[in-house]
Amino acid sequence: MRYTILFITLLLLSSCHSMRQGKQDLDQHTSQYASLLNLHETEDDYTLVQIFNPWQPSQVEVQYLLVPANDAKWNDVSETKAKENYGDLTILRTPLQRITLTSSCHAYLLDELRALDHISVMCDTGYVMAPSVHRWMHDGLAFDGGSSMAPNNEILLAAQTDAVWISPYENASTSTLSHLPLTLIYCADYMETSPLARAEWMRFYGRLVDKGHEADSLFRCIETRYDSLISVSHADTLKARRTLLAELPYGPTWYVPGGCSTSSLLYQDAGYDYLWSQDNHAGSLSLSPEAVLAKAIDCDRWIFKYMNTDGDWTLNDFLAQNPFYGQFKAAKIGEVWGCNTSYSDFFDVTPFRPDILLESLINDDERFFKKLK
């Protein structure tokens, strides 16, 4: 599983003003796109981070205060004052030196920010596609932490990990990690409801490894490029908006992206008429194959992700999986596109580089999804 199931600051008298000011600002949502993340820069160059509960968005799940490790002004009294002003929070001395990651997309992001040297443990290494991360581990600079569902506690302690990045899941327990002297970083980016909202979380992650300015700059570039690509897509009036079906059934259930999901919004930004775009769910819809056939039998294109270590499917391979597939128009006209995640870096790249995926979908360049022939 690519993602783990696991899911202030300031001085004495001189700091009191800025902390009170920060508290007054907490009612303001400072993220431009992300709905589950707030970053508050204080006057003393500290960063107060609020992460909201994805299932109760009005509730703050956890607060962190990022304090530079070399800040000589910070002391125990500063911490007491910070907690008096902001309530329950975790103090993080940044940059975090030795991080455990449970998701390959965060490893890819740290590579983009030139911060691989902060990774001490990587879980689910079989799903990591980035060559630089593999070299980092091959050279003995990071340990294999085992499964992201249950990281090897002995490895985490031996690696002297000071923080574990986990993706929180509803009702999931972190009891296997909670008794360890480790800080948990809640990575709820995957629950955001737009491509740029998820990508904006890089501004938080960058600040954890002293790459805040680089992360801000990268995000601005991604935002600009993404918006430019939308303009190109919507300006192409010569190409009618093609109806789109996404994903494959698993057993008796077909999970398609909800209309308010990041996938749905990205498909629409790429110029597709996504068939469930009017739905109001941010997650996946659990449908029967018959219900999908009734709605999508005449779809112009069908895209999906699959795993096959023996190589990419041909169209005949695909149709042989289930005779049911041949009833769809897209299968009949050869408009079936698949992404073999056994070899593709789709899950590494696209969460924080939605611009790359958007460009690929617009240009049909087969960077991720390849036409089955």
Give the residues covered by each predicted segment.
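Positively charged n-region of N-terminal signal peptides that target proteins for export
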Residues: 1-4
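C-terminal motif of bacterial Sec signal peptides marking the signal peptidase cleavage site
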Residues: 12-15
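Bacterial signal peptide processing site
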Residues: 17-19
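A short, structured surface patch at a secondary-structure boundary
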Residues: 55-159, 163-169
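Basic- and aromatic-lined ligand-binding clefts that recognize polyanionic substrates
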Residues: 98-104, 108-113, 214-270
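Short helices/loops that flank or line small-molecule/ion binding pockets
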Residues: 150-160, 287-298
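Structured C-terminal subdomain patch of bacterial secreted/periplasmic proteins
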Residues: 195-221, 304-373
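His/Asp/Glu-enriched short active-site or ligand-binding loop at hydrolase and phosphoryl-transfer sites
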Residues: 263-284, 303-306, 338
